[in-house]
Amino acid sequence: MEVNDTSLHKGFGLDINSQRVFGAQAAISRNNYSKVNASINPSPPRSNDNSNKEFSYSKDVNNNGAVEELSLTQLFEVPSQAAFAKQSSQDISDDELIQHDSRKVISSPYSPKQTHTVLKRLYDRQSVISDHEKLLTPQNVSNSSQILSPFTSLLPSTLSTLKDTPLSVSQNEKNLETVGEVLVPETVAQHRTKFYDYTLDEMENETESGQVETTPTRLATSLGSPVLYGRVESTPPAFLPETSEKQYKRKFSFTEPSSEKVDNTETKFSKKTKNINDENFPNPFNVISSYETSASPSTVIDQSSQVSSIFVNKRLRKSVNNQAISRSDSLSLDTPKIDSLFTRASIKPLKPSQSPNSRRSFKNRVLAFFKGYPSFYYPATLVAPVHSAVTSSIMYKVQFDDATMSTVNSNQIKRFFLKKGDVVQSTRLGKIKHTVVKTFRSTNEQLSLIAVDALNNDMVILAHGEIEVTVPISTIYVAPVNIRRFQGRDLSFSTLKDMKFEETSFLPSHDSQRNRSSLKERDSSFVKKNLDSESNQLIFDDCVFAFSGPVHEDAYDRSALETVVQDHGGLVLDTGLRPLFNDPFKSKQKKLRHLKPQKRSKSWNQAFVVSDTFSRKVKYLEALAFNIPCVHPQFIKQCLKMNRVVDFSPYLLASGYSHRLDCTLSQRIEPFDTTDSLYDRLLARKGPLFGKKILFIIPEAKSWQKKIENTEQGQKALAHVYHALALGADVEIRPNVAHLECDLILTMDGNIVDETNCPVVDPEWIVECLISQSDIST
């Protein structure tokens, strides 16, 4: 074999002058080093003349002490199984190493500590080579095409299938499923320069420039020092490698941590950060945070915005916007504003002059009657006087301090200023009644509108007996019985002239942000369109509404309709129709009487339950029990269109489906006079079960308040009890069948043995009575 370029000697790691071959040092086993020199034919020594084109042979010493020559092909010869068997037969411990030298062979045992030192130096090369992969493949040199792609006839049989055959794995490695560690001669690690004719830096430069490459016949991995090529599997070292600072700077990522599966491509920003790291941070690892490269967070945002949009996300946008708001001039912060990619649209914070309260004066402060529960007179702000289309009288739209909007009559509102001797209550003092001593202003600073009264006072001194206490005037509320003594504080035309009112059309305060269907969007647009013309007409000022459902998800926009009803004077009951009646379970008695309406229901004339279709939901069944109309949402739209409360009969829904009759029944509403109050009509009504005595058997009735109310089954039982009371029956709750006079016995499962021969029914019987609106037992 002839080679025309002497650079091949350098590529193979051959020192021609010293006649040494460092590749011969690669004959390594797991336990020891054994020289495999069987069947090696000696060849004449190589001449020192560099003009000779034939490779020489390096000298070595055999077991008999004779000098032997190694041919070039022996460098690539894989040890046979016989050689491994010969090695394993030798009685040598695992801690013994055989040190190879080109002139002699010396066997010396090494301690585990020294073995660790050898391994440490091996990890300095950043790789571990298994014992069956100890051969070194030739480098890719331009003038060595025959070596890179050897013919079978030119190479030994062990290399004839090297390109297409995977490397063999010993049986021990298959069992252990790991790659064995390699123990290298200490002389290689200590005297590295003796085996190379150029320094490590030169080798790195050639590798980086592409002059030294791996052979395409093997899966090669480039190593640091020395540069070895072969099929290598490595594990992370348990100690810190002794590597130069330059190598760490070259191998660490400076922008973001990434896994091995992600392509860590450097951008302009990362290269810029890398240069900054090299100059200002000479630590061994040179890993810094991006926040240390700039003086302020705004600089970091500006730099990242110039690189790529991948750094932009919703959370970052939101944080930047919040920073811009906090740095606005209105908050008097010295921090400079952020002027970056994310703040192109100027953010205009709400100024004090633009707040809704600024359009009103403290003279607008009133005490208004709250139609919900509990019903007292609370501090509120008068929004505007409105005209009622039903009563043709002036009403007042007010906003309570908790932002609740309501509409009250002229006899349900008073100017909010207190006089000495007024009997009031405070939310900070419980239900105890106190007498007003005096009111005063505690500070000269500008206070919120909800913190003062109509005289711009913010504190009040109250007395209870001989004890006086000072509380904020915004915590005051007055019972309807005591409001009659508030003489001289009615609203008049002269007092209204001094007040400031908003020029508003009372549109819905907000649009629904939930995803609506096209049907819901048409509902909202229709409602808003019909509000623009005569929006000040409170057509629902004497109406109460309860919304059930929708049963179908996209049936109607419930939120928009609730807002429209409230803005037109109506009251929306979120919990159903129960607030209109007394609480039957408040008495804590087992014998319950039929329901009676509360007197506050005198404020309304009509009540409606709105749903898209009939159902067996609680609010819907309550409406059937109280004989209150259940209407379609189209009823509200028609009222807005006609600007008055229209006849509800065309919009009535069915009562429900009767399993007993196997059909759907219509809702039958008794005719009534709309001028009568809701209280009078409910009080005069008698349900279909009026006069009936029902015994409700509940096993936990002995402690029904603790057990029944706190369980799902118990709440269902109480709902059926409430429906029976709404139908006019008297109900008694017992844990078992007692010898009591009753018309029928109601149980949750309907299975009970009764000796009194009373009919036993289940809750479905109550539901059938509600749907049919009659007593089905007769």
UniProtKB/Swiss-Prot annotation:
Mutagenesis or variant effect for residue 184 to A: Abolishes formation of radiation-induced crb2 foci at DSB sites. Severely impairs checkpoint response after DNA damage
PTM text: Phosphorylation of Thr-73 and Ser-80 by rad3/ATM promotes interaction with chk1. Phosphorylation at Thr-187 is dependent on phosphorylation at Thr-215 and Thr-235. Phosphorylation at Thr-215 and Thr-235 may prime the non-canonical Thr-187 site for cdc2/CDK phosphorylation.
Region Interaction with dimethylated histone H4: start-end pairs: 370-404
Main subcellular location: nucleus
Signal sequence segment: none
Residue span of region Disordered: 35-56
Entry function: Essential for cell cycle arrest at the G1 and G2 stages following DNA damage by X-, and UV-irradiation, or inactivation of DNA ligase. Plays a role in the response to DNA damage. Interaction with rad4 via its phosphorylation sites in the N-terminus couples the DNA checkpoint apparatus to chromatin via interaction of its C-terminal BRCT domains with epigenetic modifications on histones H4 and H2A, respectively, in the G1/S phase of the cell cycle, and facilitates recruitment of the checkpoint kinase chk1.
Gene Ontology, cellular component aspect: chromatin; nucleus; site of double-strand break
Domain comment as written in the entry: The Tudor-like region mediates binding to H4K20me2.
Phosphoserine modification, residue list: 80
Protein's name in the database: DNA repair protein crb2
Molecular function per GO: chromatin-protein adaptor activity; histone binding; identical protein binding; methylated histone binding
